[in-house]
């Protein structure tokens, strides 16, 4: 059996989709449980079949899926897993989405557009999820899209600990890639010894996806070792451009830090050649450092395991952030 037992009753069960089984195994190791066996396969027409190999009746179930490419396939697989647990009489179902899909579509920019991030929350609820866990949502308002508890976890302590251990904080300047993430940059600056801040002002094209048409630095980065942060990096165009702007403004060096390394082509080429000393990310999405000498991948598994344990024990997830959630 793979469940963790409490008071002679089967309780905690961890389930993994096929997108990133390595992360689920790492979380399971932290929790001292096994990932519950599941049969999953694709039919010839692209439909997905899932079935769990053990009883889930009365269990506290946690369904982990990383939404990497092909994103829509893995999203559908997680929804089917949740539906199967609901129909199998699971007591409580928590959907764990380390990287929340469609998070950038959290509002209408123009008429006749969907609010896709809200739809994802509705789909999770309809499938049978009682709770959602995610890491560093693109915008905080996504927490309100789901009609139930949402645990919004933060990777900042993991990333800042790496900075503290590997860089001299005396000359650090924390840089936000845009004005919208200045609040997050302030938290980073406080954590890194009240470091000075700057941000990159950018103008994004409304017609061409992932294209920045202009940007400039607001703040003094001359001679500074800059930590350029963001929640996610997709094609890397914005961040690579920001590195260039910081270097032109006199930055001594630039380190890039992000929670979600989407890294769609040609991100690897751009970030390898942009002049950044290091690109730091986590494994909320599957990563490979092969052929990418300046990429560092930190594990999110301990954070997810502690979160799962607090939920399972009916504890306080907020305590993981010393009162900041």
Swiss-Prot record:
Its EC number is 2.7.6.1. Binds 2 Mg(2+) ions per subunit. It comes from Corynebacterium glutamicum (strain ATCC 13032 / DSM 20300 / JCM 1318 / BCRC 11384 / CCUG 27702 / LMG 3730 / NBRC 12168 / NCIMB 10025 / NRRL B-2784 / 534). Belongs to the ribose-phosphate pyrophosphokinase family. Class I subfamily. It catalyses: D-ribose 5-phosphate + ATP = 5-phospho-alpha-D-ribose 1-diphosphate + AMP + H(+). Keywords: ATP-binding, Cytoplasm, Kinase, Magnesium, Metal-binding, Nucleotide biosynthesis, Nucleotide-binding, Transferase. HAMAP family: RibP_PPkinase_B. GO terms for biological process: 5-phosphoribose 1-diphosphate biosynthetic process; purine nucleotide biosynthetic process; ribonucleoside monophosphate biosynthetic process. Pfam families: Pribosyl_synth, Pribosyltran_N. Coiled coil: none annotated. This is Ribose-phosphate pyrophosphokinase. Homohexamer. D-ribose 5-phosphate binds at residues 204, 230, 234-238. Mg(2+) 2 binds at residue 178. Its cofactor is Mg(2+). ATP binds at residues 45-47, 104-105. CDD domains: PRTases_typeI. GO terms for cellular component: cytoplasm; ribose phosphate diphosphokinase complex. InterPro entries: PRib_PP_synth_CS, Pribosyltran_N, PRibTrfase_dom, PRTase-like, Rib-P_diPkinase, Rib-P_diPkinase_bac. Involved in the biosynthesis of the central metabolite phospho-alpha-D-ribosyl-1-pyrophosphate (PRPP) via the transfer of pyrophosphoryl group from ATP to 1-hydroxyl of ribose-5-phosphate (Rib-5-P). GO terms for molecular function: ATP binding; kinase activity; magnesium ion binding; ribose phosphate diphosphokinase activity.
């Amino acid at each position: 059996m793979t469940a963790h037992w409490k008071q002679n009753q089967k309780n905690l069960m961890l389930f993994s989709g096929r997108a990133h089984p390595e992360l689920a195994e790492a979380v399971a190791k932290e929790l001292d449980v096994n990932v519950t066996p599941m049969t999953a396969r694709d039919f010839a027409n692209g439909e997905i079949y899932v079935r769990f190999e053990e009883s889930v009746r009365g269990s506290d179930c946690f369904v982990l899926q990383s939404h990497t490419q092909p994103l829509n396939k893995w999203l559908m697989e997680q929804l089917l897993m949740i539906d199967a647990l609901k129909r199998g009489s699971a007591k409580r179902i928590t959907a764990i989405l380390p990287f929340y899909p469609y998070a950038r579509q959290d509002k209408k920019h123009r008429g006749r557009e969907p609010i896709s991030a809200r739809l994802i929350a509705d789909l999770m609820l309809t499938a049978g999820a009682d709770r959602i866990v995610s890491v560093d949502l693109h915008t905080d308002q996504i927490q309100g899209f789901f009609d139930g508890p949402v645990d919004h976890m933060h990777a900042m302590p993991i990333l800042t600990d790496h900075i503290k251990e590997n860089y001299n904080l005396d000359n650090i300047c924390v840089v936000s890639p845009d004005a919208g993430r200045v609040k997050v940059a302030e938290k980073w600056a406080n954590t890194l010894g009240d470091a000075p801040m700057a941000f990159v002002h950018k103008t994004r094209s409304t017609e061409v996806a992932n294209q920045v048409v202009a940007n400039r630095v607001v703040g003094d980065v001359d001679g500074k070792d800059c930590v350029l942060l963001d929640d996610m990096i997709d094609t890397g165009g914005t961040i690579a451009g920001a590195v260039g702007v910081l270097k032109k403004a006199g930055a001594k060096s630039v380190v890039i830090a992000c929670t979600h390394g989407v890294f769609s082509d040609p991100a690897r080429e751009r970030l390898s050649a942009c002049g950044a000393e290091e690109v730091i990310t986590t494994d909320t999405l599957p990563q490979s450092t092969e052929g990418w000498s300046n990429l560092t991948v930190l594990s999110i598994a301990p954070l997810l395991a502690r979160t799962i344990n607090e939920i399972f024990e009916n504890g306080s997830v907020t305590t993981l952030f010393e009162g900041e959630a």
